[in-house]
Amino acid sequence: DLEGMESIPYQDGNGRSVGYGFAIAHLTPEELALIENVENVKEEEANAVLKIKVDKLIKKMEREIEGWETIEGGRKLALISMAFQLGVENVLAISPNKSKNWPRFIGYVKEAAVSKGMKRESLFKKAADEMILNVNSRGHKFKTYWYNITPKRALLMNQLLRGL
């Protein structure tokens, strides 16, 4: 269990969050309608909101990654988890910051999704490496922001993306 469900709002980097890390200020009217009391969220309410959020995220991934349907379950889980935590636009490199923390990551994923055999495996391995470690323009290696804030999650998702 990487993160549990929190019934009571708590402070984090997004302000106040509740449930499975839902920033209260960013809950949509549709999502808020599923919650009786945002100050004491029930697990079934949080699960309903989570389903909406994940369904939207998956639809976006399907639109943006050609061959999404060929990606194996564990690898999809890793990509979905990463996108849920960091924002799908950041993972897909379509946000204003253009995925500055892993500049080659999504390129490897997209190429792997339409490749086969050893090439596919090699590309997923490269993408998994990018989750953890990057190289700057001067050739210096550094840990990604994601790894630094949630190392256990990053390492687990790294293994899943590798197909292990």
Give short role names for the model-derived ranges.
Residues 32-67, 73-91, 99-111:
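Alpha-helical segment that forms one wall of the substrate-binding/catalytic cleft
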Residues 2-5, 16:
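N-terminal mature-domain "stem" immediately C-terminal to a signal peptide or N-terminal signal-anchor/transmembrane
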Residues 12-34, 54:
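Substrate-binding/active-site groove segments that recognize
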Residues 5-10, 62-76, 124-130:
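Surface-exposed patches in mature extracellular/periplasmic domains of secreted proteins
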Residues 18, 79-80, 127:
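Residue-level detector of buried hydrophobic side-chain packing
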Residues 51, 88-164:
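Long, amphipathic alpha-helical surface segments
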Residues 10, 20, 24-26, 70-73, ...:
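Generic structural "secondary-structure junction" signal
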